[in-house]
Amino acid sequence: MRDLVIRRCEPQDYEAVHRVYSSPDAMAGTIGVPFSSAQEVREELSRERDGSFPLVACVDGEVVGQLTLSVYMNPRTRHSGHFGIAVRDDWQGRGVGTALMEACLDLADNWLNLSRLDLRVYVDNAPAIALYEKFGFDIEGTHKRFAYRNGEYVDAHVMARLR
């Protein structure tokens, strides 16, 4: 792969992140609604939140993926976090998700001391499930009819990694 860099998401990245989430396959894997505007993405990413760490994956300076790690801020759950990830359709299966996951887990383990990370993933997203399992995530349960996507309800697994 060419030069792949994971770094903090900056305001100049917002348009490119919008393009990531505008990719049909990337969008289908999220709980977002298609056709979100660049302004909506900009507002979401620019909202400063305690415990939120937005990252981007760049290949030769071009944003091709995005991950946001968020710490649960309740005093009783601050040992836990969750994340969402998306990779542009034309970069899926090329190591971008793996690199984002490695950066996420480094941040969670070595800087934030999180002992639990969890996520939701649609049950039909086999490549994502395989990626998460590769990093030690296990399925803890399934939310039935979790989201409405493309005219039908879909289930989602809750996956978590404990350390």
Predicted segments with their positions:
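A short beta-loop-alpha structural element at the N-terminal edge
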Residues: L4-R19
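Conserved catalytic-core motifs of GNAT/GCN5-like acyltransferases
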Residues: D118-V121, E133, D138-V154
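Helix-loop element at the rim of GNAT/NAT acetyltransferase active sites that forms part
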Residues: R19-V33
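Conserved GNAT acetyl-CoA-binding A-motif
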Residues: D109-R120
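Conserved active-site alpha-helix within GNAT-family acetyltransferase domains
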Residues: R94, T98-A99, N110, V123-G141
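Terminal substrate-recognition subdomain of acyl/acetyltransferases
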Residues: E152-R163
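Acetyl-CoA-dependent GNAT
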Residues: R8-P11, T30-D90, M101-A103, L107, ...
